[in-house]
Amino acid sequence: MAAPAPVDWRVTLRQRVAIVAVTTAAWVGCIEARLVYLQLFKRADLLARAERQQMRTQTVPPKRGDILDRRGRILATSVDADSIYAVPTEIANAEGAVKQLCAALEDCTARERQNLIERLGQQKAFAYVRRQIAPDQAKRVAALNLDGIGFIKESKRFYPNKELAAHLLGYVGIDNTGLDGLEATYDSRIRGKAGTMLVQTDARRHVFSRFERPPTYGSTVELSIDEYLQHIAERELHNGVLVNRALGGTAIVMNPRTGEILAMANEPTFNPNTYREAEEAARRNRAVQDLYEPGSTFKVVTASAAIEEKVMNPDTLIDTNPGRLVIDRSRVITDDTGRNSGVLSFANVIIKSSNIGAVKIGFKVGTDRLSRFVSLYGFGLQVSPDFPAENGGIVWSPEKWTDSALASVSLG
């Protein structure tokens, strides 16, 4: 049997080199094809992804405009306050950093402490530690000189007169948004326009650049309120509530010629600087949200309807004898004095607040005309856009007015 021919090592080498060359060419071709695909078809997506990974944008709240009284005195303003932020990617030991931060802040709860450990342990470029802190807290935290911890100047709402005009002014949340009162009604005007802070990081998420576009200040709003009159109204209302052991009360001072509100006070009240500590009932603006019967003040509406419709004049005599008036066979109306007032002039009916006289005037005016004047005076309607929560009141439809209802409306 013949021996096998010897294998030429040169042929084997050439075959192996050819295999390696083909494999390498195919591998390089795949890489090039992938690169072409990424550059031609995925370029925009990759650029956007890289930008998202390297750049973080944080909103910087604007400074709200001031709220002034009619003489330019400040009722609400904004002051600078430090907010602590962290760059978690620059913090090697989150638990240790939180321990030092809470020691400096002095009032961390167990829940806040745990929440901070979790947030500072995440691989993020930005996280708030605490916002709008007190100056002494800011000094203590700054003295720690911790890596990855910095400060942002934010705007904090401040009410220098504390409880004064609290229900009118309302209050502002942590994000600089008006939550109640005029702060909420005129929020878009007072708030201003937010700025931005751009943070750039490298591949290891280390911050190498920060850029801030400053916010735009909000507009100043001037009210018809007079700070001095507001103070007097609140003081006297408070004393009246104490003396009468009342649950609450309202006092309003108006300019009768223009309808301007010069003061609006409510009891109980609250401090808008610390509104979270106040009960909801104390934050309610009773002057515009609660319902009240107008009482004898409504007699002027009845009287003005009679004069305008020329039903009576100020010299018309009205007989209130015998000191009682029966309506619908069962309802008896008397004057509050409990005595027979006799014959009164139209003017004296109003001066003495005679119930019987007012009812007789109302019956002369009639349901249709009196109901029209009730509407003309704005009863049952919201009278000001300044108070979105205003309760317009309850006014019966004239079709439902009985004689007893007409009597009730006439005397208030």
PLM regions and their residue ranges:
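Small/polar-residue-rich segments within soluble enzyme cores
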Residues: Q15, F41, E90, G96-E106, ...
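Short, small/polar residue-rich loop motifs at catalytic or cofactor-binding pockets
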Residues: Q54, T59-K63, A194, R245-G248
